[in-house]
Design a protein with these regions (language model features):
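Transmembrane beta-barrel outer-membrane domains
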Residues: 41-43, 83, 110
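Short helix-loop boundary/capping segments
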Residues: 62-102
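Outer-membrane beta-barrel domain signature
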Residues: 37-41, 79, 104-106
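Residues on the solvent-exposed faces and adjacent turns
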Residues: 26, 73, 108
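Short, hydrophobic/aromatic-rich segments at coil-to-beta transitions
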Residues: 1-2, 21-25, 68, 97-105
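Extended terminal
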Residues: 85-165
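N-terminal beta-strand/beta-hairpin edge segment
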Residues: 1-43, 47-55
Length: 165
């Protein structure tokens, strides 16, 4: 599978397992985050890319992912002007020995918004826990914009989301 549309690109080997799951192997993608604005009120700029040895999808849920997602030149595109955030990476791996579920470790490569945290998903639920520190995390307008999902603290804010599919 290979597709290029503008600055966006997707490449992967696609297979279908007898249990109904779809598997992408040797997968890579590049997406400009501006594309997301067509679907979500996401005020984030930058280049999103990923490389995966494998991604397994069953009944619409990612059941296994081995790879990395990177956000380069991340920018909060605020009405008052763009706020540079930085470069980030999420390393994904299998959640357990049965390879059912995925965990991700978020880290900051460089930037004025320092993010660290974990993500996990199974067939039925997900959990996201992120800590944000640094100068941008203490910026009042940015904190206000994040207040829908974030809990302020002395150093910045925390995001803790859990849910079921």
């Amino acid at each position: 599978l290979s597709s290029v549309w503008g600055q966006q690109a997707l490449r992967a080997q696609l297979s279908y397992r007898p249990d109904g799951s779809i598997v992408l192997q040797d997968a890579a993608f590049t997406v400009n985050t501006q594309l997301f604005k067509a679907f979500f009120p996401l005020y984030l700029g930058g280049a999103l890319s990923g490389e995966f040895a494998q991604i397994a999808i069953n009944e619409g849920h990612v059941t296994n992912a081995e790879g990395v997602v990177r956000l380069r030149r991340g920018v909060w595109t605020a009405r008052s002007g763009n706020i540079p955030l930085g470069d980030y990476q999420i390393d994904f791996s299998s959640a357990d020995s049965a390879a059912v579920g995925t965990v991700g470790a978020l880290k900051t490569i460089t930037g004025s918004l320092e993010l660290s945290g974990n993500l996990s998903s199974t067939l039925t639920d997900y959990q996201i826990a992120v800590e944000a520190t640094g100068p941008v995390a203490r910026d009042e307008s940015f904190r206000q914009a994040m207040s829908i999902i974030a809990i302020p603290n002395q150093d910045g804010f925390s995001v803790s989301l859990t849910g079921q599919y």
